[in-house]
C-alpha cells in the first residue's frame, strides 16, 4: 500500500497515489484475484458467489444502507464493502484477503 496519510477535520485517512494524474489512472490500480480459478474479481455479483461458497452470508443488521456486509457464522469477522463497486479499493481487498487466507490475492492491474 502506498500513498499519503492525510489528517483533516479530526480524521486521518490514507490517500493512495495522491500525485497521480488522471491520464494514467489504471497503472497503479489494484485488482483482487480468486486464487483457485485465477479469476479477477470484476463485480460484486462474482465476489458474492465466491464468498457464499466460502461460507459467508449477507448481513443486513448493520443499518448502513451504503454498505454491503457479509458475516461468517463460524467467526466474529464482518466484511463491509461500499455498495458502489467503483469505490472497491485495495483497503477492502486486503480486508477480504486477511479474512480468507489462501483464496484471494491482491496485485497490480498491469
Curated annotation (Swiss-Prot):
Role summary: Modulates the competence to flowering of apical meristems.
Top-level taxon of the source organism: Eukaryota
Name recorded for this polypeptide: Flowering-promoting factor 1
GO biological process: regulation of flower development
Family: Belongs to the FPF1 family.
Matching InterPro entries: FPF1 (IPR039274)
Amino acid at each position: 500500500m502506498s500513498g499519503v496519510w492525510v489528517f483533516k477535520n479530526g480524521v486521518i485517512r490514507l490517500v493512495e497515489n495522491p500525485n497521480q494524474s488522471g491520464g494514467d489512472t489504471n497503472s497503479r490500480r489494484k485488482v483482487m484475484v480468486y486464487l483457485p480459478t485465477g479469476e479477477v474479481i470484476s463485480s460484486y455479483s462474482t465476489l458474492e458467489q465466491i464468498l457464499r461458497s466460502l461460507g459467508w452470508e449477507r448481513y443486513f443488521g448493520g443499518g448502513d444502507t451504503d454498505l454491503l456486509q457479509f458475516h461468517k457464522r463460524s467467526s466474529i469477522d464482518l466484511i463491509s464493502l461500499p455498495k458502489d463497486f467503483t469505490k472497491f479499493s485495495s483497503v477492502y481487498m486486503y480486508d477480504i484477503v486477511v479474512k480468507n487466507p489462501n483464496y484471494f490475492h491482491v496485485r497490480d492491474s498491469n
